[in-house]
C-alpha cells in the first residue's frame, strides 16, 4: 500500500489514512516524518478560534477590520475586495474555502500565534504547528516556513473532528462547513472528482471535506472522505528540494492516494 509513496527519488512523503470507525490503516508511509505543510496549519488557527468561542473569548459575529500591515496577495479573495471588515465566521469561511492569506493574517492578529500554539499542545500534538503570519518576502529572523506537521497528527485531527471529539456537534459542524467549502480539490480529493466550488454533499455516493497546502516545494492535503457506510481520515504531504519542480510527478500520486481511500470506502 505504500508503494506509491516510494516512486519518486528526491521527494519526501508523510502519509496516513485510517478508517475512522474501526481504526484500520488504509495506508501509511513515514506518518511521523515532519514536513513543511504550507497552509495546512491554518486548520489550527480555525480550531483556536472555535475554542475561544467556547470559552466566551470570541464571538463569531465579531467584526474584524483588516490593516495594510496584514495585507498579502496570492491565495484568497479578500485582497481583491473593497470590503474592509468581515465577521469572524466569514473570515473562517474565506480561510476554509480559499485558504485566504489576508484573512489568515487578520485572524492571527486577533487570536495570536501563542494561543494557537497552546491549543495545538492541548490536542496532544508535538510535531505540527502554525509558525508565523503570511509574509512575503519573509524578513530575516522570521520562521523559515509557515507551517509544519506530520500525517499522523493531521489525520488524527480529522478523525477526531469527524467523531465530534474536539467540540460539541454544532461547533464541529462549523469547522466541517468551513473546510467543506474548500475549492482546492486538485490533490487527494481529485480522485473523487467533486465540483470544486460546491461539494458539501454526496457526489456519486462520496463526500469529501479537506484542507490543502501549496508552496513551491510543497503539496499537502488532509481531510475526511466518507460514504454512508464508511469514513476515512487522511493526510498526504509531499516535499522536495528548492530549485526543482516536481509538481507534475507528485500530483498523480496524490490522486492515487485518493483511489486507495475510495477503494476502502467501497470495499
Model region roles, listed by residue range:
Residues 47-55, 109, 156-163, 262-263:
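Short glycine/serine- and small hydrophobic-enriched flexible loop segments
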Residues 55-81:
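Short, glycine/proline-biased beta-turn/loop segments that scaffold the active-site neighborhood
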Residues 10-13, 108-163:
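Mid-domain, small-residue-enriched loop/turn segments at the edges of structured enzyme/sensor domains
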Residues 28-35, 77, 81, 141-144:
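A short glycine/serine-rich beta->alpha loop
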Residues 71-105:
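Conserved catalytic neighborhood of penicillin-recognizing serine enzymes
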Residues 11-34:
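Short, conserved catalytic-motif segment at the N-terminal edge
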